[in-house]
Structures are given as C-alpha cells and as structure tokens.
Amino acid sequence: MECCRFGLVSVPVQLFTAVERHTIRFHQVQRGTGDRVRQKRVNERTGQEVPFEEVVKGYPTEDGWVIVDPKELEDIAPGRSRTLEIVGFVDLDEIAPVYFRDTYYLAPSGPQYTKVYGLLREALATANRAGIATFVMRNRQYLAALKAEHEVLAVYLLHWADEVRDPHRELGASLPDHSGASEQELRMAVQLIEAMAIDWDPADYHDTYQQQVQALIDAKRAGGTLEPGIPPPRETEAVDLMQALRASVEHARAGRSGDRDTH
C-alpha cells in the first residue's frame, strides 16, 4: 500500500499486521521412519513435477480450461490499486461483527507525513466514525473500515455483502420462532446473565488448547505422556432447565461474593 486518500487529502502510509498467530505448526512426517514428507506440483496426466514458473491459473468450464496468466490479473486490477481510497464515513456500531475479518495497523511512511496522519486519526476519533475504504492487496480487492484505535489508525478488513450467508436461509427450520420458555425461566436466565456480567479484559483469556498441545509435545519429548482433558458437559434436558438455571445463578453469585472477600 502506498497511500491513504480521503477527499483531496492523501498521506503515504505503510500497512502492518496487527495480530500475531500463535498456532503451533506441525510438519508432515512418515509414521515409523520420521522422514519428512513434502508435497510437489505434479502434472496430473504425466506424473511429472512442474516448475513453479510454468504454473498458471485455470478456470474450469465444460469445454476444458480458461487459462489466465498472473500478469493478466495484474493488468485488470482496479485503478489506484495501491491506494486505500476512503469513500465515506460511518458509525462503526452499524457494522455487524460477522463482517469483520483481519486487522492491520497503518503508519505514516515518513516523519514528513505525521501531521496529515495525525489529523486523520484525531478527526476520526473526534467524529467517532470509521472510514469505509477499498484497496487491492495480493491481486485481490478488499473492503475495509479505517478507525482511530489506541493512538494509531487501524484497518479492519471486511467481508463483502455477498460473502455473508443469510442465517435464515442457511439454518432454515432449525431456527425456532420463539424459545418456548416460561416467563420464570426467562427471568432466571436474565438473572444468570447479570450475575455473570464482567468487565472485558482480553488479557484474562488464553488459548488453553495451544498450551495443552505444547504440554503434550514437551511430555512426549521427555518420554512421557499427558492425561486426557476434561470431557465436555452433558446436554441440559428441558425438564432440568429451571433447576440448572437456579443452580447456575447461585454458583455465579457465590463466585462474585468470594471475589469480593479476597479483595
């Protein structure tokens, strides 16, 4: 990306990844030998390996393949492909969470551009709005929301409208018109929600599965093993619903009382 443009104002920027994935990566090896297994690009008809530079893109049709060269895709990329073009400003709350994808940070390309960068950041924060923009990255066009976030400009990639599935069409008859719960059950469920209300702090949450995977690797490396995890809870039967809700509320309130006693 070369610049961010809003109206007649533009600022040269750089794009940085905002999230670091911590997924433990495994390699494919052969059972018994431990030999590394690698994948190759192979001609399906001849069985011969194909050099990377000879690989192009093909779109399947009834008559065969429509062959498209990477250079042809570059030639038809939208204009200003390296520009984050802001087309309007919206309240971020208007965008449903299902539309959000990855997050990036924007930084000015040099110290001479910090004033314009800072102006856009402060203007977005003051107006409490997000800029809706489009840009092209890696031969693909993206829709994005630009927002002032923690003294930087954050770019939230968004799904296009036709990428988001209609839940009523996808889930169909499995969606109930109403829960069928009694007023007493509803009140108890609301009480449970209120009893479990907390302040959001992302540092309180950790990927315990990845921690368990690492513990398994460490245990096997030392010649040991790891105990299985806790089994999933059983499903709540409809006849037990009120009892389960009441017990949950009491448990949540007891936990709150214990937290207060320790502070």
UniProtKB/Swiss-Prot annotation:
<comment type="function">
    <text>With LigD forms a non-homologous end joining (NHEJ) DNA repair enzyme, which repairs dsDNA breaks with reduced fidelity. Binds linear dsDNA with 5'- and 3'- overhangs but not closed circular dsDNA nor ssDNA. Recruits and stimulates the ligase activity of LigD.</text>
</comment>
<dbReference type="InterPro" id="IPR006164">
    <property type="entry name" value="Ku70/Ku80_beta-barrel_dom"/>
</dbReference>
<dbReference type="GO" id="GO:0003690">
    <property type="term" value="F:double-stranded DNA binding"/>
</dbReference>
<dbReference type="GO" id="GO:0006310">
    <property type="term" value="P:DNA recombination"/>
</dbReference>
<dbReference type="GO" id="GO:0006303">
    <property type="term" value="P:double-strand break repair via nonhomologous end joining"/>
</dbReference>
<keyword id="KW-0227">DNA damage</keyword>
<keyword id="KW-0233">DNA recombination</keyword>
<protein>
    <recommendedName>
        <fullName>Non-homologous end joining protein Ku 3</fullName>
    </recommendedName>
</protein>
<keyword id="KW-0234">DNA repair</keyword>
<comment type="subunit">
    <text>Homodimer. Interacts with LigD.</text>
</comment>
<comment type="similarity">
    <text>Belongs to the prokaryotic Ku family.</text>
</comment>
<dbReference type="InterPro" id="IPR016194">
    <property type="entry name" value="SPOC-like_C_dom_sf"/>
</dbReference>
<dbReference type="InterPro" id="IPR009187">
    <property type="entry name" value="Prok_Ku"/>
</dbReference>
<dbReference type="Pfam" id="PF02735">
    <property type="entry name" value="Ku"/>
</dbReference>
<feature type="domain" description="Ku">
    <location>
        <begin position="6"/>
        <end position="169"/>
    </location>
</feature>
<keyword id="KW-0238">DNA-binding</keyword>
